[in-house]
Amino acid sequence: MKKILLVLVLVAFCVVVGCIPTSINPLYTGQDLVFDPALLGVWRSEGDSKDTWAFEKAGDSEYKFLYTDDEGKTGQFEAHLLKLGHTRFLDLFPDESGIEGMDRSGYYKIHLLRTHSFLKVTRIEPALQMESLDLKWLREFLEKHPNAIRHHKIGEGDEAQIVLTASTPDLRKFVEKHLKTEGAFGEPINLKRKQSETKSHK
């Protein structure tokens, strides 16, 4: 793909995790998917935020993820938990129903592109903690090393969004290479189970 005319980034939780890089291709392959039942249930951000993250089983190695923000707006995703080396990641991909439900013409919708995002899972119990690839770090790194990984930059300066266009194998190599690179991953996202969920898991 030489040019991306429009990228629809259906990550309603951008405010929580910060603006994040997205990818045309998934981080996972069929061989490294794992399923951990500990992820199932409803989680909420620590602090005053009222947003929730709800995970349901959708298959042997797939979750349905529903994000609800402070204003009650929702976004539904296909979620896959995977292992990259010894590290677990959560790959998120917007559910097609989000586009189908838009009050727009079919011609408009064919120009919208769903993309993947991924979060490094540092722990699930007793609280869910994840980190995203830091967009600012990635911008600066690619300015210095533009051939490190195939990508497309949309916009300029601090507002620029990075869409990774590399194949899944190349994407995995890049992420694994920078697992311990200082600044490559952002501040942790800390989530705790909703009280009712905590009781049901005892």
Locations of the language-model features?
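Positively charged n-region of N-terminal signal peptides that target proteins for export
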Residues: 1-4
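Long, low-complexity intrinsically disordered regions enriched in Ser/Thr, Asp/Glu, Pro/Gly
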Residues: 7-13
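C-terminal motif of bacterial Sec signal peptides marking the signal peptidase cleavage site
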Residues: 15-18
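Calycin-type beta-barrel ligand-binding domains and close structural analogs
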Residues: 20-38, 46-52, 57-202
